[in-house]
């Protein structure tokens, strides 16, 4: 949060450094601009956006994982201030990933929504966790879109105190989530089997977006979304 309130030459949401001197320069500029918190330096995992995965889980008040759902991002926002924000997500399934993260969450006695970002490392065939967000992510509607309403899990647990049999639901889905116009998906997602899957979902109507909710639509909102989409188109063309 503190990072959002400072400004300096070269400021981005995230960086990839090949030169230690460049790293030192950015760190100095950040602290000179008023940043006071720690910084995280991680090994760069090779590969494009399609190597990413995002996992959402709901853990109840008794620290039991009730539901897990995995997404396969195909495209991210390319702009410097929003790098890493997902723009297109396919549903995915990986029981090995589910079970390892389930064990971790229950071992630390976690409670609430957990949102994990990870990337497949082709160097050793393992998924490397980048972070856990202690909240829903900005793209977490892809879980609800695929039939697993995150808000309902809160109500069932904290309001209704619905009994849980201990069998964690590992979700499977069939819908593509988009934050961007369909034209950007078609133009910028790398060619391959995953893109073909997404194209079939678009053609069959098995897709959705957080933005265009019909019951919340009015002329001003429609114009705002069109403006947002025009910014996305300029951003992808530029970066």
Over which residues does each language-model region extend?
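Oxyanion-binding "anion nests"
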Residues: 80-83, 91-116
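Conserved metal-phosphate-binding beta-hairpin within the catalytic cores
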Residues: 105-141
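Glycine-rich phosphate/pyrophosphate-binding beta-alpha loops
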Residues: 75-86, 133-147
